[in-house]
Amino acid sequence: MIGIIGAMEEEVTILKNKLTQLSEISVAHVKFYTGILKDREVVITQSGIGKVNAAISTTLLINKFKPDIIINTGSAGALDESLNVGDVLISDDVKYHDADATAFGYEYGQIPQMPVAFQSSKPLIEKVSQVVQQQQLTAKVGLIVSGDSFIGSVEQRQKIKKAFPNAMAVEMEATAIAQTCYQFNVPFVVVRAVSDLANGEAEISFEAFLEKAAVSSSQTVEALVSQL
């Protein structure tokens, strides 16, 4: 069983509509869609936006469906200036950009008693990288950071880049999903696409290009599933 998590309806609808033998159940107000995609058993959920929603949905998915792996799909704001709208983002590490326990000796972004970063499954990273090469998509592997704020100003962007110079993108759920997977020992990877450049025009860009990002990330996830 492959678990696929997206925060927004636009981020999961494309994949959901491709399921055969579709079945829907609801647990704690979270909807799960099970079916067959590319001859693989999958379960797709729309988690809702933000870290708490993401952690709840991931926990429910793992407990109910016992997935072998989890893929987080959707959109993200680019922090790397070489990225453009529609480019595919593949996580190697994910971190929180809004966690601060440095007073107790932890690194900025680190949750106490948790790793500094949550590492994606290396075999999954390799599989996704092969897929994007086959599809001739522009993609980047790197650090994705998460927090409970939409990054829509130059000031917000600069603050994150100062704290995490190597971060390529920012969004609102991936690290919570990753932490949950870490605690349940479930391999994961984040496969998102750029919807905006996390700057003063981010809100306009996000609304205009969310669909493009959703198509790009969904196509990549579908191709990945076919290879698993």
Swiss-Prot record:
EC number: 3.2.2.9
Pathway stated in the Swiss-Prot or TrEMBL entry: Amino-acid biosynthesis; L-methionine biosynthesis via salvage pathway; S-methyl-5-thio-alpha-D-ribose 1-phosphate from S-methyl-5'-thioadenosine (hydrolase route): step 1/2
EC class name: hydrolase
Intrachain S-S bonds: none
Catalytic activity: S-adenosyl-L-homocysteine + H2O = S-(5-deoxy-D-ribos-5-yl)-L-homocysteine + adenine; S-methyl-5'-thioadenosine + H2O = 5-(methylsulfanyl)-D-ribose + adenine; 5'-deoxyadenosine + H2O = 5-deoxy-D-ribose + adenine
InterPro entries with a match to the protein in the record: MTA_SAH_Nsdase, Nucleoside_phosphorylase_d, Nucleoside_phosphorylase_sf
GO molecular function: adenosylhomocysteine nucleosidase activity; methylthioadenosine nucleosidase activity
UniProt keyword annotations, A-Z: Amino-acid biosynthesis, Hydrolase, Methionine biosynthesis
UniProt keyword Hydrolase present: yes
Positions contributing to substrate binding: G77, I151, M172, E173
GO BP, sorted A to Z: L-methionine salvage from methylthioadenosine; L-methionine salvage from S-adenosylmethionine; nucleoside catabolic process
Residue positions of the active site: E11, D196
A GO CC term assigned to this protein in UniProt: cytosol
Protein role: Catalyzes the irreversible cleavage of the glycosidic bond in both 5'-methylthioadenosine (MTA) and S-adenosylhomocysteine (SAH/AdoHcy) to adenine and the corresponding thioribose, 5'-methylthioribose and S-ribosylhomocysteine, respectively. Also cleaves 5'-deoxyadenosine, a toxic by-product of radical S-adenosylmethionine (SAM) enzymes, into 5-deoxyribose and adenine.
Family: Belongs to the PNP/UDP phosphorylase family. MtnN subfamily.
Protein's UniProt name: 5'-methylthioadenosine/S-adenosylhomocysteine nucleosidase
Organismal lineage: Bacteria, Bacillati, Bacillota, Bacilli, Bacillales
